[in-house]
Each structure stands twice: as C-alpha cells, then as structure tokens.
Amino acid sequence: MQQQQAWAAGLGGLAVAGVGEEGGGGGPAPTTVDEASMERSKSFVKALQELKNLRPQLYSASEYCEKSYLHSEQKQMVLDNLKDYAVRALVNAVDHLGTVAYKLTDLYEQQASEVSTLELKVACLNQQVLTCQTYTDKEGIRQQQMTGTATRHHKHYIVPTLANKRMQAFSEMQTDADIDSRPRPYPSAKTLFWHLASEKNSKTNGARQSEFVLEETKATKPASRGKEPSTSPLPKHLQTNLASSDFAMHNVGMKDQPGVRHLSSFSSFDNPRGRQIQKAPLRTKSMLAAFFVKHKSGKMKNVSVR
C-alpha cells in the first residue's frame, strides 16, 4: 500500500509540473511595450528551464520503478503502473516541447519586429543626415563664392534681339521666294480689281474699234461717190469690184500698222503673269460683200473672155 501511494505521489508531482507550465502565464497584464517583451522573455526562459528539469525527474522515476519491481511481490501491478507513468511522462514532455517552441516563435517575431522598426528609424536618420550634409555643402559653396548672388526674376516676355530679327526677316524672304519659284499646277488667281479693269478695257476697245470701222466706211463711200469717172472702158460691175477691194485693202493696212495697238493686248499691271486678252477683229458687211462680189466678177470675167 505504501508503494502505491508513493508511486501516485510521483505521478501527481509530474502532472502538477506540466499544469503549472501551461498556466504559468497568469499575472498582471503588461502596460508598456518593454514590459510585454520582458514578460515574453521570462516565460520562454521558465518553459525552457522546466523542460530541462524533466530529465532528472524521469531518471528518478525509472530508478524507483526498478526498485519497486525487484522488491515487490505484485509485479504485474508494478508493470501496469510503470506503463501508465511512462505514457503520462511522454505526453508531458511533448507538451513542454510545444510550449517552448511557441514561446520561442513569439519571441523571435517580437525581436524581428523590433529589428525592422529600428532599421526604419536608422534609415530615417540617415536620410536626415544626408539632407543636412547636402544643405551644409551648398551653403558652404555659396559662402565661398567670390561673386555676388544676382537676383533671379521670372521671365514673363521674351524680347528678340536685333540679330534674331534679321535672321527671321531673311528666312521669311527666302520662304516667299521659294514659294514664288515653285511651278503651279493651276493658273494664278486673279483679283477683283484685275477682272473689273480687263472688262472695262475690253468694252472700251470694242466701242473704239466699231467707231473706227464705221468712220472708215463713211469716209470711203463719199470718196467713191464723188470720184471722177475713169477714162478706161471698164464695165460698171468691174468698177464696183475695184472700189470694194480698195476699201478692204485700206482696212487691212490700217489694222496691220505697227503704231496701232489695242489696249486689250497689254497685260494687266496688277497681275503681270496673267493671260493677254485679245479680241477677234470685227468683220463688217462691206468686207463680206467685197469678197462675194470678187468671186462673182471673176466668173463674169471668164464668161466674157469666152
């Protein structure tokens, strides 16, 4: 009976040790970050120490089981108690290992977070130091410069210089010359003034030409009427033919004179490249009649010769 009580007391102590490890986190909650990290570190150290204490406990339990088995008469009951104790000891050891691993992972994550925070703070400090150093270098260079600092103003307007004006005018003139020298596939455009002037000139030339022809016909008719009869024995129809041919030659001679020029033959002053407008010569009834009479007189002459 005493052996069973001792055996139960040993198993109870081992179980209480495991439960104490699991519920060892009870206590006042930490208020700051430093206190929380300290509590995590303490719990990890405590779990690791309890895991280390399992070894001597297991050794002492094994020695006690061996002595009990040798000196006890109920060996079967000792073996059953030993199996139960071994299972509980194994479960408790695994529980201690899990607790230690969890505590270690938590502590590692906390340390990694603290390290990343410190790295961020160090990077911010380095950036601030670099900014201060750059500003210090610029300020030192500015103070070491011998020349005075000139005030800078924003340019609202850009005034071209004289050379730029000359170059711009020369480029515009060259562009205009290139455009004028290019061949155009269509005729050049006429202005309204050019059309009005050409229309006025054509009307004036037509009126003058008609007046000139009428005056010539009037002048030739009285001359032919007042002309003395020739002494040659020409027939009357031959004399009429001769008068009409003289009149036609006179008109042709007047038109072919180099001094007589029409206004329509000159090009316009507004557009020197424009086409020259020339009007066809007017043919009066007397000229046509002269040609017809000439043919008739030729036929009659041939008949008279026969």
From Swiss-Prot:
GO cellular component terms given for this protein: cytoplasm; cytoskeleton
Region (Disordered): 200-236
Cellular compartment(s): Cytoplasm, Cytoskeleton
Identification of the protein by name: Probable protein ABIL1
The species this protein was found in: Oryza sativa subsp. japonica
Family: Belongs to the ABI family.
Gene3D superfamilies registered for this protein in UniProt: 6.10.140.1620
Function of the protein: Involved in regulation of actin and microtubule organization. Part of a WAVE complex that activates the Arp2/3 complex.
Presence of the UniProt keyword Flavoprotein in the record: no
Assigned keywords, A-Z: Cytoplasm, Cytoskeleton
Quaternary assembly: Binds SCAR.
